[in-house]
Amino acid sequence: MLRSWEFVLLISCFLCFSSDALQRISLKKMPSIRETLQEMGMKVADVLPSLKHRISYLDEGLHNKTASTILTNFRDTQYYGEISIGTPAQIFKVVFDTGSSNLWVPSRQCSPLYSACVSHNRYDSSESSTYKPKGTKITLTYAQGYIKGFFSQDIVRVADIPIIQFFTEAIALPSIPFIFARFDGVLGMGYPKQAIGGVIPVFDNIMSEKVLSENVFSVYYSRHSESNTGGEIILGGSDPSHYTGDFHYVSTSREGYWHVDLKGVSIENKIVLCHDGCTATIDTGTSFISGPASSISVLMETIGATLSDGDYVIDCKKINLLPDITFHLGDMTYSLSSSTYVLKFSDETECTVAFMAVDIPPPLGPLWLLGATFIKQYYIEFDRQNNRIGFATSF
């Protein structure tokens, strides 16, 4: 039960904006973990040797207290937004992740022995007048370590929308890879089915407050690499100034997940993969595009890329000669040019191809993950109201 003054606080906050207004979250662009390692003269495989050939998902174990969480690019994203937790507000940089459904941030109770904790903003429950303990322990297990913590309840503000939210205070963070991360925590934008511990996800709590004109959110990533203004997430709709033409919608293919049918992957108008269909998810929590190891191997061989220290690379002089790679989603095709899917770091002569092999076992996989490399080219609308994803060409 809310105390009376907490209720008044929430009501007064809700009166600050119209229920049909778009609620905006500014995204900032940061170096990804991969880019941070590059700046330090290190490669991913130097830090995480198991990535040298491919990454394999752990078997899912979605039960109440412990679950295996997909590693992919170890939340190797470049985009974060700010939220606040508590009263007065404590500010956190979080990744808005469509591949998960829980909110976690480092806790003040995290031991100084975990250097990844002390290098980030930490939630201090003793400084919040609206904090309520829950205490249920939770472990999120990664391929290279784990996050341990416990559930707490407090007022979380996202785009100035206040909600009462259960979240995880992380008290154990592995140094690898999180010490290299520029974000503090993760805010899952997935369905309740993915939520560990049976908590209600943040976006579901926002929807229940009836403050949005539509139960959708849209994601825009800026293409302008020279700016640290990374883009925007809009709750309740989309912004026509971010895209051209119309949205084309694809229904989700699996209940409770942002999965869609991928009808093919083609090069030069010839389908080379997924002839009989595959499954893909639009993953805002990762930078690269990933797929089954056997498929990625064929794709990279087709464009002439080779595997080196865990990454697919190609001679930088050949970038302009490479073909478009096209994804068939619904009745539309979505192409990526070589300047989009090939990355050049500093003055290196070998450039990194933004594809990687990730084998996800059944029942969740096999699965393609279309990360920031894809999202930068297409404005994406995630529609919970109709269980579909919309795609439009972004500016």
Swiss-Prot record:
Chain ranges of the Peptidase A1 domain: 79-392
Locations listed in the record: Secreted
Cellular component annotations (GO), alphabetically ordered: extracellular space
Pfam families documented for this protein: A1_Propeptide (PF07966), Asp (PF00026)
Processing after translation: N-glycosylated.
GO biological process: angiotensin maturation; negative regulation of renal sodium excretion; positive regulation of artery smooth muscle contraction; positive regulation of blood pressure; positive regulation of vasoconstriction; proteolysis
Major localization class: secreted
Enzyme class: hydrolase
Positions of the propeptide segment: 22-43
PROSITE patterns per UniProt: ASP_PROTEASE (PS00141), PEPTIDASE_A1 (PS51767)
Keyword terms, alphabetized: Aspartyl protease, Disulfide bond, Glycoprotein, Hydrolase, Protease, Secreted, Signal, Zymogen
Glycosylation sites: N64
Superkingdom: Eukaryota
EC number, UniProt record: 3.4.23.15
List of catalytic residues: D97, D283
Record field: catalytic activity: Cleavage of Leu-|-Xaa bond in angiotensinogen to generate angiotensin I
Tissue expression profile of the protein: Expressed by the venom gland (at protein level).
UniProt signal peptide: 1-21
Molecular function per GO: aspartic-type endopeptidase activity
Protein function: Renin is a highly specific endopeptidase, whose only known function is to generate angiotensin I from angiotensinogen in the plasma, initiating a cascade of reactions that produce an elevation of blood pressure and increased sodium retention by the kidney. This protein is also found in snake venom and shown to specifically cleave human and porcine angiotensinogen into angiotensin I. It does not have general protease activity, no cleavage of alpha or beta casein. May be directly responsible for elevation of blood pressure in the victims of envenomation.
Full protein name: Renin
Organism the protein comes from: Echis ocellatus
Lineage of source species: Eukaryota, Metazoa, Chordata, Craniata, Vertebrata
